[in-house]
Amino acid sequence: MDVKTAFLHGELDEEIYMEQPHGFEDKRYPDHICYLNKSLYGLKQSPRLWYIRFDTYVLSLGFVRSEFDACFYFTQLENDPVYLLLYVDDILLISKSIIKIQKLKKDLSREFEMKDLGKARKILGMIIERNRSDCFLKIHQKPYLEKVIAKYGNMNSKSVKVPLAPHFLLSKSQSPKTDSEIVRMETVPYANVIGSLMYAMISTRPDLSYAISLLSRFMSNPGMDHWLALKHVVAYVKSTLDTGLCYSKRKDVLELVGYVDADFGGDRDCRKSTTAFYFTYGMNYISWKSQMQSIVAMSTTESEYIALSESVKEAMWLKGLLSECKLCDSSPIVFSDSQSALCLAKNPVYHERSKHIDIKYHFLRQHVETGDIKLLKVGTEDNPADMGTKVISSTKFKHCLDLLFVG
C-alpha cells in the first residue's frame, strides 16, 4: 500500500511560519506571513512528524513496534499474526489470513488516504516473483539495473563471469595527479554509477558487495584504472541481470547461520583488512556485508577475530528480531575458516600477540561463554564469505553463490 501525501498528515508540535506562496498571496494582507497548522513537504520536521503520526495510530490498532527495527510492527503472534513494514510512505502487509489483511487495509484507509496496490509485486525497485505451487519466491532488480545500464551507456559490451578480475590492483596511487587528468576524470560519472550499483548491492545483489566496497574507497578522486574496474563491474551486471535472492523451504528446522571471513592487509594503501559476513535463515539469504576494518590488524588471527566480532553484532541483532516474532529459539551459528580466531574467542587466555586487541572486540567472548552464539569451523573451500574479501576465480565465485542460493 502507498500513503498519498504522507507528510501532510504530520501534526506540528511547535510554531512555524512561512512566506505566502508565490501566486497565492492574500490581496488584503500581502505583507503577512502564514502560521502553519500542519506539516508540509520541505520542512525538516516533516518525516519525523509523519512517522510519529503513523506510529501512534498503528499502536492504537493493537500492533507492537519492534524493539530492533522502529519501522516493523506485528500483532499478537498466537493466531495468524500480521506483519507491517513501513518505508517512508510505502507499506508491506504480511499474513496468512486474507481477512486480517483486508481489515487492516480498511483501518489504514479510514485514517489516511491510501492507494491499494494489491499483491506485492514490486517495492522500492525490487521485483517480487512467486511460484506458490513450488513454495518459491525470488527478489531481483532487473528493470532497475537495465535503467542504470541504459542511463550510463553501453560502457562495456564484453560478457564477464566475475565482478572484478585479478589484474585490477587498485590503489590511491592510480588517482589523477595532473590538472589534465583531473579535468578528464571530472567528465566520468564514477560516483553516480557507484551509487546506483550500491543500491542494488544492499538490496538484492550480495555478489557485488566486495567490488562496490572496494571501488567506493576511491570516490573522492577516482582515476582511469578505477573507472576501468567499474566498467568491468557494469559488464558483469549486464551479464547477470536476472540474478537475485531465491527463497524456498529448504529445511524443516529454521536456523540462523552466518559465514564470516577476512583477508589480511588487503588494502594496498593503508594495509587494513576487509571483513565479510553473510547470514542465512533456513538456508535463505537475509543479510550480508563487506567492509574495510577500522584498524590495521597485526596478524591474520587478529583480522579474522575482528571479523568474527563484527559478524556476531549482526547475528545478535538478527536473533533479536526473529526471536521477537517467535521465529528463532536457538542460538545463531557462525562459521569461520580461521581455527586460530575461533580458539581465541572460545579460550580467552592471555597471549602476548593478542593482548593489544581493543576491548570492544572482546564482547564476542562473552556471547560465546553465555551460549548466545555458537562458533564452528568451516573449510575455506566451503566458506561463501570468501567472495566478500578478495577477488576469486569464476569457479569459486559461482560455488559461493550456489552455497547461498543466489541466482
Question: In which residue ranges do the predicted regions lie?
Answer:
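RNase H-like nuclease module associated with reverse transcription
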Residues: K122, I127, F218, E255, ...
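Mobile genetic element proteins and their domesticated derivatives, centered on retroelements
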Residues: D2, M18, G42, F54, ...
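RNase H-like nuclease fold core
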Residues: L197, G258-T301
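Metal/cofactor- and membrane transport-associated sequence elements
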Residues: M1-E113
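Secondary-structure capping and boundary motifs in well-ordered enzyme cores
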Residues: Q76-D80, I182-V193, M201, P222-D225, ...
